[in-house]
Regions:
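ATP-binding/phosphotransfer module of carbohydrate and carboxylate kinases, centering on a glycine-rich
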Residues: 2-4, 30, 156-257
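Short glycine-aspartate micro-motif
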Residues: 2-6, 61, 124-128, 218
Length: 257
């Protein structure tokens, strides 16, 4: 089985695949202080919770933005005698990139592009709501060509609470109205509905620039479900898109030999 790992700045998403089938998925906080020992213990706990055996994992594929944790995950792979592969330059042969600097494109964005083309077809636009909000554009030939990066919803809310003396931190949840009735609801509207409106505006412009109004729009990331309640801009909400892309890249690498 393959364990696909998407290491974000805030959360680490994991998916266990048996071939192309997603057997189980988990999320845990991304903690840069974690050692291989701590990661191993957490993994054993997740697997035990669902009656799964860590011994069944014969490969681990990583995509992430936290280099020091990649080293710890490699150590875990060694412990369980699993092959390890990192999404990056070594997997370039099975990905399609037309960005100005392909080597600088984040591994999670590459995985999103691969999954979007594979499972939903091209052209496509992926809106990934995580620590940052990433928008990735895949052209009609299936190539990643670029996109946009904006501050994530939680970053924006935390900055507002930190810099505005009378505005406290509020729960991150979708408001019921577009017109806030009190300060807390106003912050939710500005943050969540504002993120939805930003996505709507950027997606509309990108579709025009592509010349393809029919591009499939996919929302993913840990906060996609919250934002999706405030907009009809998304054709698909797939919270597992990135780990599915990691699995697909691994499968292609195996076929390549």
């Amino acid at each position: 089985m393959l364990l696909a790992i998407d290491m974000g700045n805030t959360q680490t998403a994991m998916g266990l695949f048996d071939g192309d089938e997603l057997v189980q998925s988990w999320r845990m906080p991304t903690d840069r202080s974690y050692t291989a020992d701590e990661i191993h213990v957490r993994l054993m706990g997740f697997f035990k919770m669902y009656g799964l055996s860590l011994d069944a994992v014969d490969a681990i594929a990583f995509a992430g933005v936290v280099p020091q944790l990649s080293r710890e995950w490699h150590a875990v792979a060694d412990r369980i005698a699993a092959d390890a592969i990192v999404i990056g330059p070594q997997t370039a042969a099975v990905t399609k990139l037309r960005a100005a600097r392909p080597q600088a494109v984040g591994a999670d964005r590459v995985a999103n592009a691969v999954a979007a083309e594979t499972f939903y077809g091209a052209p496509a636009i992926v809106v990934d709501f995580g620590t940052a909000t990433n928008i990735d554009v895949i052209d009609e030939d299936g190539y990643y060509i670029g996109g946009a990066i904006a501050p994530g919803i939680r970053i924006s809310m935390d900055a507002l609470a930190a810099r505005a003396a009378k505005l406290a931190s509020v729960p991150l949840e979708a408001p019921e109205h577009a017109i806030g009735r009190d300060t807390e609801e106003c912050i939710k509207v500005g943050s969540v509905v504002g993120a939805a409106a930003m996505a709507e505006g950027l997606v509309a412009r990108m579709k025009r620039e592509l010349g393809r109004e029919d591009a499939t729009v996919i929302a993913t990331g840990g906060l996609a479900g919250i934002v999706a309640d405030s907009t009809d801009a998304f054709d698909v909400v797939d919270g597992q898109l990135t780990i599915k892309g990691i699995c697909e890249i691994y499968r292609r690498m195996q076929e390549l030999g």
